[in-house]
Amino acid sequence: MAKHSKSIPGRGLRVADQIQRDLSEIIAFELKDPRVGMITITEVQVTPDYAHAKVFFTMLSDKKDDIKNTVSGLTAASGYIRGQLGRRLTIHTLPELHFVHDTSTARGIEMSKLIDEANASRAKDAED
C-alpha cells in the first residue's frame, strides 16, 4: 500500500504529459471551432484524484478579446475534447478540463527586456 501511494506523483506527471500530447493533437487536427486558432498547450496540471485538469495554453495574439474568444471556444468544445480524450486514455477518471491562458512567456519576454535595459545602463555608466 505505501509503495503505491509514493508512486502517485510520478504517475500523475505521466498522465498530465500524456493528456498534454493528446490535447495538442485533438485541438490541432480535430477541433473545428473558428474561435480556436493556432494554440500551443504549454502545461497540464492534474489534481491527485484526476477529477480536474488545468490546461495552460499560449497563442500568437495577446489581445484580450482574442484570448477571451479562444477560452470561450475551448470551454464550449470541452465536452467534445474530453470525449476524444477518453477514447485515447485508459484511466478510470477522465478529468474535467479547465482552460487558462498562459502568461509566462509574456512575463519572460518582459523580464528579458528589463535585464537588457539594465545591462545597457550598466555599460553606459561604465563608459562614463
Curated annotation (Swiss-Prot):
Molecular function per GO: ribosomal small subunit binding
Protein's cellular compartments: Cytoplasm
PANTHER family: RIBOSOME-BINDING FACTOR A, CHLOROPLASTIC-RELATED (PTHR33515:SF1)
Gene Ontology biological process terms from the UniProt entry: maturation of SSU-rRNA
GO cellular component: cytosol
Biological function: One of several proteins that assist in the late maturation steps of the functional core of the 30S ribosomal subunit. Associates with free 30S ribosomal subunits (but not with 30S subunits that are part of 70S ribosomes or polysomes). Required for efficient processing of 16S rRNA. May interact with the 5'-terminal helix region of 16S rRNA.
Species lineage: Bacteria, Pseudomonadati, Pseudomonadota, Betaproteobacteria, Burkholderiales
Pfam families for the chain: RBFA (PF02033)
Organism: Janthinobacterium sp. (strain Marseille)
Keywords: Cytoplasm, Ribosome biogenesis
Gene that this sequence comes from: rbfA
Keyword Metal-binding attributed: no
InterPro entries found in the cross-reference section: KH_dom-like_a/b, RbfA, RbfA_dom_sf
Domain of life: Bacteria
Protein name: Ribosome-binding factor A
Summary of subunit composition and partner proteins: Monomer. Binds 30S ribosomal subunits, but not 50S ribosomal subunits or 70S ribosomes.
Gene3D superfamilies on file: 3.30.300.20
Family: Belongs to the RbfA family.
